[in-house]
Amino acid sequence: QMRGSRSKALAERALVNCRYSLAAFSTGERRRRPPHGDRQCAELALHLQQSFEAAILTHLYPRSQIDIYVQILQADGGNYCAGVNAATLAVMDAGIPMRDYVCASTAGLAEETPLADLSAPEEAAGGPRLVLALLPATGQIALLQLSARLHQERLEAALEAAGQACRALHAVLDRGVRERLREVT
């Protein structure tokens, strides 16, 4: 909780501003969307902001604003997670210092079997869906969201599946960042 004025807080650290939206052609539905998304997009933008505020070293950029805009071009499952992972690479490529990568994955259950990185049909099946954004080096959870009630044992299994997916993704992202760094230097 921030105490004092907003301007004082911005004088001490950077403001992370996020926008999340779906392109009009990204889904099969043909309903008209507002230009900057709907209520769900606003909620996901807030989650994105909270996830990156946990990772970006905002104190190094007082009186600054870091904008992260995510637009999903093809909504085929795990949209928010794909946006988080892409934004992580973009922030790193921009040279903004971070405590750790922010890696995100979904998880769910298919007949008691935990699944990670759900596709659109798996998400649409209606079972409980878990979204995990993780800082893998520290194990800190930046975001944990569950779409339905779930028994504790099943929750632990789904959380473990999402955590393993995030750690595997971290290895892939880290390898890509290191290759990019070799190209640049």
Residue ranges and their predicted role:
Residues 1-185:
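Polyanion-binding surfaces on beta-sheet-dominated domains and ring/shell assemblies
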